[in-house]
């Protein structure tokens, strides 16, 4: 079965290198990046999903962290020759497993930062432990609560926060001319904060929200929810789907089975997921589904340099999350170098000084380190984002990508600008 949608011109091709969960087998799930510890090594924990519902994202994030660390270490490291040593742990897409892994990184591996941290539930579970241990955490999770409360300045989000996703996604749907929409969303701390801001944007843009249905994760079936949303009379012109890959595969199969006519815009973590969605349902079923996500700085010198680092063979290759671990390693190196310290309470104070404007824009980590050592004020430009932060550690100036699946490929429709402050 297939859908017919309007074509767009610019193609984002899926890269072949280390794609999806299959690449997890190329690495041990946990272990040090450097075979032997040298005196003065700086231990960094990297907590990522390699298994479970979020496992598609771990391998490329690991690869980016390793390659970026190699660049820093091969150039002599930081603070007079100290090298980063990475310890990887699989959070299994589970807060319980993520918490156990974090404790190991702190207590056994003596890590001075924990980075990666893809899922919001995992981030929220480990946050109290890391903050209590006075250890920096750098996350890709979007739930607003991750940076709430007294974080001691230790929590840094390399991602747009959830309340910024909803309005931007609604704006993309309004740009398609849809006047009636419904929302089908998973019950979790990442998704729920998106809904009300999205509704306000729909209302301001003249679109009517017909219905909102919240479902639980890992339900055996989503038939009742799909029937209520897609089978309504009148049916919405489009449905905003907010959740994860595994539930979306079931939802799409169900709406195709019932012959639904409503268009779909989903989160890219549902409808892209490093190519896993198309693999699961096939290109015909996926045809025309639109999706939306905070995007890396596509087309910039920093992103082109990152594509080369990752071994991408196409200038339009799309990495939604791998750039985050690249940027986290770079930010740690720059902040520690500037602070001349590996104490999280000390070096995290220097993150705005190396990442935020004003300053000379630099996208090369070795050049950036040299300038920091020379006392030059820099504004580091990352591969996952331009790395600007507010006082709470939330990311600013993050843009969003609106994509459409056509003939088994992800095509960029437009870039939506996010909040600037």
Region spans (language model):
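Sec-dependent signal peptide hydrophobic core
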Residues: 21-25
